[in-house]
Amino acid sequence: MTPRVSDPFTGQSIESARRTLAARLRSAQLEEAELDARILLGAALGLDLTGLIAQAARLLTEAEASRIAQHAQRRIAGEPVARILGTREFWGLPFRLSDATLVPRPDTETVVERALELFREQKATQQPRIADIGTGSGAILLALLHDIPGAFGVGTDLSLNALETARGNAVTLGLADRSAFVACSYLAALRGPFDLIVSNPPYIPSAEIPKLSLEVREHDPHLALDGGNDGYDAYRALIPQAAERLAPGGALIVEAGQGQARNIETLLTAAALVVDRPPKADLAGIPRAVSARKMPP
């Protein structure tokens, strides 16, 4: 049961409420208490940072104080800020979330970076076809469509809720006419050929999920986390299907968990794909975006 948090914000100014909220979050041992407080306060009041500063002395209304208290209660209970707001920025673009989607993380931007790197290096077709497997909110696919004019993309997911969320994000970003979303397992409903296939598949070993942070294990969908006994179930299913549906010269890019990149490269090679460069690392130096090509006959 979510613990109740009293409302200490009624009658406070915006600046006083910010300090109170930050103190409460610090007391709950939340690492980014100051940043979380500013974001949650701004969301509750409909103000950006400039607005919070400009109106710092204004007293809160009763409704505003109630909203701030609700945000505080949810954050102290371990709910991520992005879940509370229902949105997260990825690749500089806003994405709505749902219970069926992961919160897009900066680590996954390495997949987008590697894809754009490959497109710059080769003479891609004027209308490249992209598939995003396990699309969730559509973050990877829609980021690529945003940056690759003329590309058309298909996102697949088992969750109808996730697909609805992805379609909504495509509409918001003005990319609905260049994207489609299909309910299926991996690439089962797709024929290809595709110039690029991308995926952030579930890769957490089943036994490790209870050890994840509260924010992840209680608020991210387990379908998008659980990679089976050793964490490689999704890769074993995805890679052979992707190899069959890649166009000659096309590339497959997948996100890897910590310590998984080398084993994934072995699976790629076993599917007759060519690993022609090292994985792209995230900001912590962990190899994340693992890629391979289907060589022309």
Swiss-Prot record:
Annotated GO biological process:
methylation; translational termination
Judging by the UniProt lineage, the source's domain of life is Bacteria
Positions that bind substrate: N200, P201, P202, Y203
Chain residues that bind S-adenosyl-L-methionine: G134, T135, G136, S137, G138, D157, N200
A single GO molecular-function term is:
protein-glutamine N-methyltransferase activity
**What InterPro entries does this protein's entry cite?**
DNA_methylase_N6_adenine_CS, HemK-like, N5-glutamine_MTase, PrmC_N, RF_methyltr_PrmC, SAM-dependent_MTases_sf, Small_mtfrase_dom
Keyword Hydrolase found: no
Catalytic activity field:
L-glutaminyl-[peptide chain release factor] + S-adenosyl-L-methionine = N(5)-methyl-L-glutaminyl-[peptide chain release factor] + S-adenosyl-L-homocysteine + H(+)
Q: Which Pfam families match?
A: MTS (PF05175), PrmC_N (PF17827)
Keyword Endoplasmic reticulum recorded: no
Q: What is its EC number?
A: 2.1.1.297
- Keywords assigned by UniProt, alphabetized: Methyltransferase, S-adenosyl-L-methionine, Transferase
Top enzyme category: transferase
Please describe what this protein does.
Methylates the class 1 translation termination release factors RF1/PrfA and RF2/PrfB on the glutamine residue of the universally conserved GGQ motif.
Record's PANTHER family? HEMK METHYLTRANSFERASE, MTRF1L RELEASE FACTOR GLUTAMINE METHYLTRANSFERASE
Q: Belongs to which family?
A: Belongs to the protein N5-glutamine methyltransferase family. PrmC subfamily.
What protein does this entry describe? Release factor glutamine methyltransferase
Q: What is the lineage of its organism?
A: Bacteria, Pseudomonadati, Pseudomonadota, Alphaproteobacteria, Hyphomicrobiales
- Gene name, Swiss-Prot/TrEMBL: prmC
